[in-house]
Design a protein with these regions (language model features):
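Ribonuclease/tRNase effector modules and their secretory precursors
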Residues: 1-92
Length: 92
């Protein structure tokens, strides 16, 4: 069953700063939120949406932390990591 998307959101100042610092563009953020590979609750009111991507022949997990207990949802932070086995459920 596909993970539920988030289509209405705002990017917090912190998330915008971290996206710029980490080289993650708005298009990447939108694609993860619109079609996440996985979605988990971190704590009540906060979810992490993530998807696997390949950038320059290297595989990453892009993780987006979102406060879902408000409307619109707030993107708290975004990062990418090569630690697929650590973060991806049922990693190969």
């Amino acid at each position: 069953m596909p993970a539920e998307p988030i289509l209405e959101y705002v990017v917090t100042e912190h998330a915008a700063f971290e996206m710029k610092r980490r080289g993650i563009d708005e298009a990447m953020l939108r694609s993860v939120l619109a079609a996440p590979g996985q979605r988990d609750s971190v704590r009540p009111g906060r979810d992490v949406l993530q998807t696997r991507v390949t950038i320059e022949d290297k595989e990453f997990v892009v993780r987006v932390f979102v406060d879902v207990d408000r409307t619109p949802a707030n993107v708290v932070t975004v990062y990418r990591t090569t630690k697929i086995r650590k973060y991806w459920r049922n990693a190969p």
